Amino acid sequence: MDYQIVIILLISGFVVGFINTLSAGATVISMTVYMALGLPIIEASGTNRIAVVLQNITSSLTFRKQNLLDIRSAIRYAVPIIIGTLIGAQFSMMVSNRVFNSIFAVGLVLMGVLLFIKPQVWLKGTGTSIKKMSVSHFILLVVAGIYGGSVYVGVGYFFIAVFVIGMGYDLIRANALKGFMAFATTPFSLVIYMMYGQVNYTFGLIHAVGNIVGAYFAATYASRIGTKFIRYLLLTLIIVSLIIVIVKEF
């Protein structure tokens, strides 16, 4: 493998791990890089999950050490997401690259809308006490799991919205929960992608090294870093990814 590709995968991995630990949506960077390096979109989605698992193991352990992650609650929340993840991953194996491209594009647009609609309103928490998981929360997490099991890009925003708006968590603890959800549920979809040969292990493992380092630094300094610059960066990358999808299709 050319050393330039290794450098690109490591640097982009660091950025993805850093941003995803603080916020969400940086998986668009991974998908953009993988597609630019020639991977079909479904294989790019499968390959991405290697880094997702390893990155979120790192961030979850770091948040846990800082007493920002309630493992018991996190395990309960993971159940509906696992159900949705299995459905979404199996669905992605049944559709063509063209259909997956369309779903991916819709996900990108939706993520862009979420970034524009006053994110500071729902990223700061509701200021209320933590609520127990209701039936509506369960259903929303299943739906988020379906999206995560297939497209994945931007799924963290849906997790954060449920945890912050629906349950009353503050942003840092919601991010800690979001990371644990990814760590606990992504292996289920990864196995399905592996069974269908839709994973590039070399790209995925190299990218994961950068993810791990980025996640560690972000989780360690989470309370000191702002998210304004990150949102602008993600909007730029959403546009780039949409262009790549359109070019591949037409």
List where the protein language model places each region.
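Transmembrane helix-loop junction
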Residues: A36-L37, E43, K65, A89, ...
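Residues within membrane-spanning alpha-helices of integral membrane proteins
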Residues: V6, R49, F104-L108, G112, ...
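Transmembrane helix exit motif
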Residues: T58-Q66, A105-I130, V240-F250
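Selected transmembrane alpha-helices and immediately adjacent juxtamembrane segments
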Residues: M1-P40, G125-N175, L205
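Hydrophobic alpha-helical transmembrane segments in multi-pass integral membrane proteins
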Residues: V143-V153, S189-G197, G204, S241-F250
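Selective hydrophobic functional segments
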Residues: G46-V99, T186-T236
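Small-residue hotspots at the loop-to-helix junctions and early N-terminal turns
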Residues: I42-G46, N175, G179
